[in-house]
C-alpha cells in the first residue's frame, strides 16, 4: 500500500520553511515510516536517492534531477522483487531498460520513450524463450515476429498489422485473431488453458466489440 495524497501534502507543508540541501530523508507525518532517503538541492531531490513502501521495503533506487527520476534506476515490488531497471528522463522510463517477472526471470528488454515501450525490444516467456522480437510504437507491438512457448514462429506483424497468436505459459493457445494499429482489431478467439474455446467475437482497439459467441464449458 502506498502513501496517500493527504500524507504527501502534510509532508510538503512540514518542510515548507527553508530549503533542503545535501543528504536528508522524509517520513510520513507523525510517524517514523520512512518513504525517501537521499540527496537534495534547493529543496528538491537531486542526486542519489531511495524510495520506500510503508512496509519499509525498497521501492526505487536511482538518480534524481529537479525532484524527478533521471538517469539509471531500479524499481521493486513490496516483496523486494525487482520489476524494472533502466534509464529515466523527467520521471518516466526513457532509453534502454529491462522488465522482470516476480521470479526474477527477464520479461522484456528494449527501448522506452515517455514511459512506454518504443523502438527495438524483445519480450520473453517465463521460460527464457522469446515471445516477441521487433519494434514497438507507443507501447504496442508494431513490426516483428512472435513465437510460441517452444520458440517456433507463430505470427508476424508489419506496421501494426497482422494475424497474431498469444499463448499461456504452459504453451497452450490463449488467443488468435486479427491485429491492426498495434491492437486486437477484427475477428478473434479466446481459449481456456485446456485449449477449449471460451469466446469468439469482433474486437475494436483491443476490446471485445459487438456481437460475440460465448462458449459454455460444463465440467
Q: Predicted segments — roles?
A:
Residues 1-219:
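Glycine/tyrosine- and acidic-biased, solvent-exposed loop/turn segments at the edges of beta-strands
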Amino acid at each position: 500500500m502506498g502513501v496517500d495524497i493527504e500524507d504527501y501534502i502534510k509532508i510538503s507543508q512540514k518542510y515548507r520553511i527553508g530549503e533542503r540541501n545535501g543528504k536528508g530523508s522524509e517520513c510520513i507525518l507523525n510517524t517514523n515510516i520512512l518513504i525517501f532517503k537521499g540527496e537534495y538541492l534547493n529543496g528538491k531531490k537531486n542526486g542519489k536517492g531511495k524510495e520506500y513502501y510503508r512496509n519499509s521495503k525498497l521501492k526505487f533506487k536511482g538518480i534524481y534531477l529537479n525532484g524527478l527520476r533521471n538517469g539509471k534506476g531500479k524499481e521493486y515490488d513490496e516483496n523486494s522483487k525487482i520489476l524494472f531497471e533502466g534509464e529515466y528522463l523527467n520521471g518516466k522510463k526513457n532509453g534502454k531498460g529491462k522488465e522482470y517477472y516476480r521470479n526474477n526471470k527477464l520479461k522484456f528488454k528494449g527501448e522506452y520513450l515517455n514511459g512506454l515501450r518504443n523502438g527495438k525490444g524483445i519480450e520473453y516467456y517465463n521460460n527464457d524463450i522469446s515471445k516477441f522480437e521487433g519494434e514497438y510504437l507507443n507501447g504496442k507491438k508494431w513490426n516483428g515476429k512472435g513465437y510460441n512457448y517452444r520458440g517456433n514462429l507463430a505470427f508476424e506483424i508489419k506496421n501494426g498489422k497482422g494475424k497474431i497468436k498469444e499463448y499461456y505459459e504452459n504453451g497452450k493457445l490463449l488467443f488468435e485473431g486479427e491485429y491492426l494499429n498495434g491492437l486486437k482489431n477484427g475477428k478473434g478467439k479466446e481459449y481456456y488453458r485446456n485449449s477449449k474455446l471460451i469466446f469468439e467475437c469482433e474486437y475494436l482497439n483491443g476490446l471485445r466489440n459487438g456481437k460475440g459467441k460465448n462458449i459454455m464449458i460444463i465440467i
